[in-house]
Amino acid sequence: MSVNLLAVTFDCADAANLAAFWGQVLEHPVDEGGTEEFAAIGLAGSAATRPCWMFLKVPEGKTAKNRVHPDLGAASLEAEVKRLVDLGATKQAEQDQDGVRWVTFLDPEGNEFDVVADPS
């Protein structure tokens, strides 16, 4: 038996708004029919677009640092930092460790994510 990663799921206060933000970040359209309760990116697509991103409204707010977070790669870290801040992300920190550079952000609901300078 084998498994594969089907989805990355975010608990959130407003699924449609957070999906719209991440759709812009990922440059992928939000699936039709998204609501404040549930929205997705790529769930309606083929398995080739997996993992999909899902957003599910929950009653409680975020109270602690994420134990898991997405890491995204960017050919131009500086340009991507500007683009993400313009989209509504909050820049938290810049790191350079053993020649690997990345920036940590918060999405509009406070979820951490990193953008790593793609070495290629």
What are these regions (language model features)?
Residues 29-30, 61, 110-113:
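Amphipathic alpha-helical interaction segments
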Residues 45, 59, 76, 95, ...:
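Short, flexible active-site-adjacent loop segments at beta-strand->alpha-helix junctions, enriched
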Residues 84-86, 90-117:
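Short, compact, well-ordered microdomains
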